[in-house]
């Protein structure tokens, strides 16, 4: 369990869960690659570790750091964001029902509908920008509510506190995927969520060189169940990946401010461009849930969505002519990324569902990096001129 402290997140990302190595004095947490640990006598542990799937010193340091950043008692890390999702889903039993926000990451929807549904779990996808659809979807069998806020890719925002209050009144558990905001800009546990999770691959690691996931909670019972599942399922990250994530985490506060600064500048440019139909960003007053954003977030992040005028031909032309923005899936790295969700991250979502959600062929998603803003704006401008 992580002990609470009074430090700000900019201090916790550097120090929480970490101390100088007792043997060498090294100020950086070592990469503990050993798969097994010495027992001085049969069944007697030399330390808290016996086998690296069950527990690892490098992994523990990362988990304690995340817990401190999310104002949580506990954190558990996994081999990917989807491994985190899979482990959480194992809290359920046959016949249980799950409500998910409709505009959810394509991989999450794919797992829910094409994998977990085969184990007699029922999933419904609803718009959670208001509580009406949530209340209508709830049944006596609803055990879990899963939200992303902001969502991927349309950046819709749910009122975490309002959702948590209703979910708890019905005896269910609320999970919030906080990947887009990171612990720096949003802390869902403080707003009533039972579990917060992240794809560490994104902003927490921040360097596009590590695939990992993590969850945090303040609930003792949930932690005990999830810790058992972490060990039993075994979808744990390698010590080296934990080291990379811990290293990336140290600059989270600096990076997130830079992402946000560049995102605002790009939004201001796009809103005035004649070839852009619409811009979506939580920090813009035009965002439908901007007031909720101001209430529950400390900032607005680096994800920007905009619609080009025309058809998929204009989208393809723009994306083929962009230079600094890498045309690639994923997000949250220091480098700027760009993608077309309808044929990339959300291609697994049926076309009729994409149309219903508003994920059109002219919707372009930006993961705004921390490069020089003038270079990024010049790149966007020249690509738009050619589409």
From Swiss-Prot:
Coiled coil: none annotated. Its cofactor is pyridoxal 5'-phosphate. Keywords: Amino-acid biosynthesis, Cysteine biosynthesis, Cytoplasm, Lyase, Pyridoxal phosphate. One of its GO terms (molecular function) is pyridoxal phosphate binding. It comes from the Eukaryota. The keyword Translocase does not apply. GO terms for biological process: cysteine biosynthetic process via cystathionine; cysteine metabolic process; transsulfuration. Its main location: cytoplasm. The keyword DNA repair does not apply. GO terms for cellular component: cytoplasm. This is Cystathionine gamma-lyase. It comes from Dictyostelium discoideum (Social amoeba). The gene is cysA.
């Amino acid at each position: 369990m992580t002990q609470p402290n009074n430090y700000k997140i900019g201090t916790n990302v550097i120090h929480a869960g970490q101390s100088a190595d007792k043997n060498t004095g090294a100020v950086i947490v070592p990469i503990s690659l050993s798969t097994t640990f010495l027992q001085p006598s049969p069944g007697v542990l030399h330390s808290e570790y016996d086998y690296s799937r069950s527990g690892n010193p490098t992994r523990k340091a990362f988990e304690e750091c995340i817990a401190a950043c999310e104002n949580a008692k506990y954190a558990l890390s996994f081999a990917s964001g989807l491994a985190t999702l899979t482990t959480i889903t194992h809290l359920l039993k046959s016949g249980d029902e799950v409500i998910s926000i409709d505009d959810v990451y394509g991989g999450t929807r794919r797992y829910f509908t094409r994998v977990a549904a085969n184990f007699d779990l029922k999933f419904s996808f609803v718009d959670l920008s208001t509580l009406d659809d949530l209340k209508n979807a709830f049944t006596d069998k609803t055990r879990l509510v899963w939200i992303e806020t902001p969502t991927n890719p349309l950046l819709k925002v749910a009122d975490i506190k309002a959702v948590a209050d209703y979910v708890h009144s019905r005896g269910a558990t609320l999970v919030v995927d906080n990947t887009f905001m990171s612990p720096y800009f949003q802390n869902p546990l403080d707003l009533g969520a039972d579990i917060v999770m992240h794809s560490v691959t994104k902003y927490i690691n921040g360097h596009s060189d590590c695939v990992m996931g993590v969850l945090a909670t303040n609930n003792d019972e949930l932690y005990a169940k999830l810790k058992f599942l972490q060990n039993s399922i075994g979808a744990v990250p390698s010590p080296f990946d934990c080291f990379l994530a811990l290293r990336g985490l140290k600059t989270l506060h600096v990076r997130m401010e830079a992402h946000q600064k560049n995102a605002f500048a790009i939004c201001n440019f796009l809103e005035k461009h004649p070839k852009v139909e619409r811009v979506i960003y939580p920090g813009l007053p035009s965002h439908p849930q901007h007031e909720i954003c101001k209430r529950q977030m400390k900032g607005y992040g680096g994800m920007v969505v905009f619609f080009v005028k025309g058809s998929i031909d204009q989208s393809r032309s723009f994306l083929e002519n962009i230079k600094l923005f890498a045309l690639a899936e994923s997000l949250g790295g220091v480098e700027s990324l760009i993608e077309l969700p309808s044929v990339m991250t959300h291609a697994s979502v049926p076309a009729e569902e994409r149309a219903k959600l508003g994920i059109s062929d002219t919707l372009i998603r930006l993961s705004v990096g921390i490069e020089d803003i003038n270079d990024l704006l010049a790149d966007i401008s020249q690509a738009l001129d050619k589409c």
